[in-house]
Amino acid sequence: MADVVYPLASSTWGTEEIEAIQDVIASDMYTMGRRVKQFEQEYADHFDHGYAVMCNSGSSANLLMLSLLKLKYKLTGDIIVPAVGWSTSYFPVNQNGFKLNFVDVDPQTYNIDTTKIEQAITPNTCAIMAINLLGNPCDFDAIYKIADKHNIFVIEDNCESMGAKYNGRYTGGHGIIGTQSFFFSHHMQTMEGGMVTVDNQEDDDWLRSLRAHGWCRDLSPENPLFHKTGSWKDNFTFVTPGYTVRPLEMSGAVGSEQLKKWEEIMSARLKNKEHFFNKFGDEKYLKLQKTQGESTWFSFGCICTGALTGRRDELVTALTEAGIQSRPLASGNWLRQPVMNMLDYTATGDYSGADLIEDEGFFVGNGMQDVTKGIDAMYEVIQKLI
């Protein structure tokens, strides 16, 4: 196999992150503590969220989000979801007793097709999950027009779209709850880590209890769940059916260092994006992802068309042989995954957008590193194919 000349992801770490980890080790406090709390506040302030609760992954963030809907808001029924997304966007829906209600995606933006949401709504629909795919914001004007009409909640999986904006507002803050991931391939990397964002103290308290055993020791003094008496038993009082999805203290320390690099990270990503679109924006054999709002370009999504129609797998093989890494768009049409026979869901109507992404779609990487030479190499591979 050829050496990698264009990776899907690369590290955003430098000596600062290593030193931050060493400081935590020297403190002899490895579990969630002061550095996690510091990063939570810094993240909330930077991206204009009221409150931010860190956990051990974006997947766990989604689990906490759905648990909050069930336990605090007492919602039941089905939740509208797009047919293209990630596994742990969907699984927590069922794990919290909700039914998945699939709607097709727009093959240009890869996000939920807002023209098809209303026809999927049932008397039992309680929420719409907006997944901002590959850095691209959903059409929240259209989503909220429908949600307000039917009096249903909007929640937001923003794990791939940190820092994106729609109508001047950061994604992750358009729904009543938003989630974020800090996995290696994402905009900021704590390697493993996630965040849930909300805009009120009550939700914040619920999330902090759900995050750690269901106990009350992390709750604010005026929390709605338990009146602390000051007794030694307070720290061993359990008020929600919680999990154990706390982050490590090291992850919080690294997150603070990563946030300092945010402008540098985004500058590099946008430069890579300009080069990619200069190379492929006018070509007739690839349709590139269409943005709405301000995308933060998690990666570069492509759909084979023209001379490459039906040749996606051939192209992927050629790219791999040239050292250019690629992968499916998210997980393709989720309805075609074998795990569907274990899930509780509704799927009606047309899924041609998701099918096109499944059959003709792929993406290549973007990140803090300069990938322009890799983009040039990709262009040369394609020129030899067509």
Which residues does each predicted region cover?
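N-terminal "arm"/small-domain region of PLP-dependent enzymes with the aminotransferase-like
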Residues: 1-29, 34, 236-239, 364-365
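PLP-dependent aminotransferase class I/II
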Residues: 36-41, 49-53, 59, 104, ...
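PLP-dependent aminotransferase-like
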Residues: 70-149, 153-158, 165
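Structural preference for beta-strand elements that scaffold enzyme active sites
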Residues: 153-155, 177, 361-363
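Conserved active-site segment immediately N-terminal to the catalytic lysine
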Residues: 156-190, 205, 232-237
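Adenylate-forming
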Residues: 190-194, 255
